[in-house]
């Protein structure tokens, strides 16, 4: 029976869960603050792991500072996670900022604004639209 997920994907999922717990509970660095682990991409040889994280900050300088703090703590985080996972070799962790969540929220807000503007215009011109609909039906 073929496996649904490859070994690297299963390890990446477990690594994501363990990293999220370690970053929330065990890391007490105030520079890092609230961090979300969005995804983990593990190399095929399991030597490297790219960890995609999001902070709830939009200021680029603050994001860079938090990312630098995570990179500085990467070795310590790696040792904590290695104690929780049963792997012969623990992947080297590299943190990468993932702006997709923030960008998605921004786009969602833009869509919501457009919808409310369209509804306002429709309500404003509602009578004209109703009259046009009646004349179109009479023509048929």
Swiss-Prot record:
Residues 121-140 are annotated as: Disordered. Keywords: Cytoplasm, Ribosome biogenesis. Residues 129-140 have a biased composition (Acidic residues). One of its GO terms (cellular component) is cytosol. One of its GO terms (molecular function) is ribosomal small subunit binding. It is found in: Cytoplasm. Its main location: cytoplasm. One of its GO terms (biological process) is maturation of SSU-rRNA. Monomer. Binds 30S ribosomal subunits, but not 50S ribosomal subunits or 70S ribosomes. One of several proteins that assist in the late maturation steps of the functional core of the 30S ribosomal subunit. Associates with free 30S ribosomal subunits (but not with 30S subunits that are part of 70S ribosomes or polysomes). Required for efficient processing of 16S rRNA. May interact with the 5'-terminal helix region of 16S rRNA. HAMAP family: RbfA (MF_00003). Belongs to the RbfA family. NCBIfam families: rbfA. This is Ribosome-binding factor A. It comes from Shewanella loihica (strain ATCC BAA-1088 / PV-4).
